[in-house]
Amino acid sequence: MGSLVTDLPAAFQTTLLKDGNEKGDNIHKEIHDHDITIGDEVTKEEARHMVELTEEERVIEKKLRRKIDSLIMPLVVLVYLMNYIDRNNYAAAKLQGLERDLNLNDTEYQVGLSILFVGYVLMQVPSNAMLNFCGKPSWYLGFFIIAWGLVSTLTSQVQSYGGIVACRFILGVVEAPFFPGILFYLSKWYTKSELNLRMSIFYSGSLISGAFGSLIAAGILSGLDGARGLASWRWLYIIEGTVTIFIGFVVTFLLPDFPHTWKLLTPEMKAVANRRMALDAAEADLDAGGKTSHLAGMKAAFKDPKTYILAIAYHGITGAAGFQNFYPTLTQTLGYDSIISLLLVAPPYVFTVFYSLAHGLTSDKVGNRFWFYMYPVPIVIVGALLFMFTDGFGPRYFSLFLLNFIFVMNGTIYAWIANAIPRPPAKRAAALAFMNSIGNAASIWTPFTYNDADKPYYREAMGINIGLVGIAGICGIIMRFYLQYQNRQLERMENEDATLTERDVKKLEKTAELEGIDIATARMLQKGYRYII
């Protein structure tokens, strides 16, 4: 009888034992803290409930969660807000003469916009390795926040096309580590059952930036033009970049690294924090069937068709959302000056913030991903058509509210990804990195579809947006049928008394390979598990 030992972050281990002459897997649990060995073979469900928090620990856990939420979540949302503000102030600066002062033509402006995402995509994978090497999230995140604030501030001094392209590329490089870094960081503080809501709140930072970033830009651009001999768009970079640098220092010294190192936690809270994360990891390790290396996780992710379906879908969503980089330019086509155009950006984003949170909560409550992913598709298409073929202020401004439903899809697809690729963690991490890179690659080429010659309707860009959101919708339909097929296979395979054909065994082997686990564990873990559709 062989065994597979899974190392856990706490002082206990779970050993999965496989016997080829018996059905399923047997679980042998050793708790080393107390030198206790439970020799009886138990089922997977019994193993899951063998170690739980006591009632007293649960009371402490609630206090712990409130303390974590009160500091960590406001900080990460604030930083994500500044991340998008610093990234998108390029569009606001365009309204106040950036193109004119730097002698940029239409194509050169678009290159300056898209080059950021070249650096962003290239830095995605290396950033995770850098974070693991650093080992201190506060220093790691703080350094890159300060770095992109500094780059944003120095952008105010550029005098040429080459200067703006260089600054935008470097900005993409130093902004890239933040998103995967936050995913890693939050996973060290919150259990998997707590992460969904926190990620929804975190994502709202990007939408809030669309609303308040335009209001801040309007105030700066209207009041500081010519101050100390500088154009208002230069002041925009100086002020917003300086604020980001300050926030970076706050994060460096205020953001706690890990529960066991946070001085504001009592010894009891630290113990509960470590214990609850250890229990969460133990359950995850049971699901994974063993520890999976980053290389094995990448291989498993690239062999899974779901990875490619979701990556193409995310590319379509991100590409169709490319209008956000031109939002002030789109509102300017409504017939108002640059300041009013910036103010008009805020209401659609404010609406989207509240709607997206309600959408996400409802989707979780209903337990459905497909319909909540699909219903925004026709809404976005109608919004694009309205912008393309109407002239009045009312319908054209209303079309922007409809176009913003693409951000609702963006939130839903991340929840779908988490369910469609649940284990092992290394596979999920590799799949997320791949999908994020493929998705953001759309931002490299879509800026070139928004040409000044196409004002005020931007029919080429809007037509491409319709095609991209249509592709995302088709991928959603394919995903639904594929998950239904996999659920039927899970239902068939979970019957241990059923005689498996050679074809069934091959399917089970493929499932085990895709999940990164052995065949016996795969069959046992299938019991009762179904993909959310």
Ranges and model annotations:
Residues 196-230, 237-244, 432-446:
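Glycine-rich segments within core transmembrane alpha-helices of 12-TM secondary carriers
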Residues 139-153, 370-386:
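Structural signature of the two symmetry-related core transmembrane helices
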Residues 114-129, 346-358:
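Central cavity-lining transmembrane alpha-helices of secondary-active solute carriers
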Residues 91-92, 296-361, 414, 447:
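Extracytoplasmic gate region of multi-pass secondary transporters
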Residues 122-162:
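Conserved MFS/SLC helix-loop-helix module at the cytosolic interface between two early adjacent transmembrane helices
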Residues 69-106, 122-123, 127, 213-217, ...:
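Extracytoplasmic
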Residues 140, 160-168, 231, 308-310, ...:
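Short hydrophobic/alpha-helical segments at membrane-entry points of transmembrane helices
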Residues 1-82, 96, 106, 252-287, ...:
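Intracellular terminal tails of multi-pass secondary transporters
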